[in-house]
Amino acid sequence: MKKRVKRPNIFVYSLFFLICKVLATFKFKLKVIRNELKKKKGPCVIIANHEASIDFINLTAAVKRRINYVISNSFYQTLGIKSLLNACGVIPKQQFQTAITDLKKMKEVVQNNGTLTIYPAGLMTENGVSTIIPGSSGKLLKFLKEDVYVAYTTGSYLTHPKWSKVYRKGRITLDVYLLATKEEISQMSVEELDALVIDRLSFNEYENQETAQIEYKNGDNVEGFENVLHLCPKCQKEFVMTASGNTFKCSSCGNQARSNKFGFLTNIKDGDIVFKHPNKWYDYIYELLKNEITQTENYTLSSHGKLQMIEGKKQKFVEVGEIDLTLNSKEFTLNGQVHNQPFNLVVSIAKSPMLPFSPGKSLEIQDGPTIYRFIPEDGKIVIKWIMALKIFAAKQSA
């Protein structure tokens, strides 16, 4: 068989491992609870929960095996270090879309005695709670036909949240254990495997913090969180929340909340409406939007903004035009000017039940191999797009 995926280059990966080990030990204070891969020989698959962008650093440091990571194609195309990523044996793929060539590459890793790592959720959490895990993990694990291990991380969200402008030093833990042998997997149904994966990879960082009670340096800083918690729970107005240091404040009604170094919120004055766990605030906003969508016939969401696409030679996103982006219960519509030419594209949400996004900045829509990055005029609306898509996708799958 002609190799499509290289085993990680031993020299490049050794340097990569050393860097990860130093960061995990001294910067992230990684604590490994157990590592059942220590005595494992031969190929295997690792499935991991995804709390933050630093998760791969801690996993690499803890597991002394050359790992082939499945990573976002957007990340691969725009980081500017393709040659190094190739040397590390990564498999780039479109998020939430798995092509036959992707499957062949993943299969090839384990057939060549390698270690394949997958993040089934595909996205980092924006609120400390695990994102939706697509129901395709069971089929993939059955296809790979190898022992499967879980790498379960806690604390990386509180260390480096997706929305945060600052890093917070505290504690990250990692638990690596055998989920099922290939023989056990062959005896399980796809539905049983899907349920098992969801059960073992689900997390709630704020519930965990109630027991762990770990302080994080700068852990009370909420700047950037207003791009996720964008609606005031007191006056229920959107995009009015501001954040400075450890304090949220509504610019409309004056409602305030203060964060502590554990990541919990408290009221500042009598009459403030505050959720101790930020994810509960997120859920409150989500339910309000869900009710609005349910009660509004033919609900649509529209925004005007700039459109970017990946420039291959430059290995980065570049602006190509301006569009109006519209979302309804079935599809996205992109309508405007691209490269000074009329542009219209319709993308079914069945192809994109979830979107890569940067809170307060942008979201990405995938159409086959093409990635479109949309930057709305008001970045605060990005999270509303994400919530609306979740609601529509949930209705479609119900």
PLM features: what roles do these ranges have?
Residues I381-A398:
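Terminal and domain-flanking low-complexity segments
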Residues A151-T153, V240-T242, A257, G321-S329, ...:
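Broad, structure-driven detector of short, well-ordered beta-strand segments within folded domains
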Residues R171-L231, Q236-E238, T370-W385:
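A broadly conserved sequence feature marking short terminus-proximal activation segments
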Residues K217-D272:
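Cys/His-rich short segments
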Residues K3, P8-N9, Y13, F17, ...:
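Soluble catalytic domains of membrane acyltransferases
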Residues M309-K361, Y372-G379:
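Phosphoinositide-binding peripheral membrane targeting modules
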Residues R258-V338:
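Long, charge-rich boundary regions
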Residues L363-D367:
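Short, acidic/hydrophobic/Gly-rich beta-strand patch recurrent on exposed beta strands
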